[in-house]
């Protein structure tokens, strides 16, 4: 599993050299970006509370180093062609407690 999330409108760096930038440019870029990856498991629905579907991400690498070696549990909602993942508990982001959501729509098969 690999997740890459970037806030729209992240400012470009002044220089054109790859992986370069001022300390301020690099800090802004990191505040606008989150990536993590690792194995995932989907517990049996019979073993979860209220039959809520969950997915558990075992974080092996992350742009937020505090998550490395942890598990991140997400709530799964599937309705028709829509898949939504959300945090189980609120996260504190910029001093504000909030739940995060990611939504995907399954595209029709190309023929």
Swiss-Prot record:
Signal peptide interval: none
Pfam name, any one: Lipocalin_5
Pathway: Secondary metabolite biosynthesis
Region Disordered, annotated ranges: 1-21
Family matches, as InterPro entries: Lipocalin-like
Knockout consequences: Decreases the production of 2,4'-dihydroxy-3'-methoxypropiophenone and but leads to the accumulation of 4'-hydroxy-3'-methoxypropiophenone.
Protein role: 4'-hydroxy-3'-methoxypropiophenone carrier protein; part of the gene cluster that mediates the biosynthesis of 2,4'-dihydroxy-3'-methoxypropiophenone. The first step of the pathway is the conversion of acetate into acetyl-CoA by the acyl-CoA ligase ppsA. Acetyl-CoA is then used as a starter unit by the polyketide synthase ppsB and condensed with 4 malonyl-CoA unit to produce the pentaketide backbone. During polyketide extension, the polykedite chain is probably reduced and dehydrated by the KR and PT domains, respectively.
Name recorded for this polypeptide: 4'-hydroxy-3'-methoxypropiophenone carrier protein ppsC
Organism in which the protein naturally occurs: Aspergillus oryzae (strain ATCC 42149 / RIB 40)
Organism lineage: Eukaryota, Fungi, Dikarya, Ascomycota, Pezizomycotina
Gene symbol of the encoding locus: ppsC
């Amino acid at each position: 599993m690999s997740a890459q999330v970037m806030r729209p409108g992240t400012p470009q760096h002044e220089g054109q050299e790859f992986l370069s930038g001022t300390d301020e440019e690099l800090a802004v870029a990191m505040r606008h970006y989150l990536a993590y990856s690792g194995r995932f498991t989907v517990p049996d629905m019979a073993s979860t509370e209220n039959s809520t579907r969950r997915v558990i991400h075992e974080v092996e690498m992350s742009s937020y180093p505090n998550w490395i070696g942890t598990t991140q549990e997400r709530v799964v909602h599937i309705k028709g062609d829509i898949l939504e993942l959300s945090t189980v508990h609120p996260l504190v982001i910029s001093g504000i407690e909030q739940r995060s959501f990611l939504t995907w729509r399954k595209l029709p098969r190309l023929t």
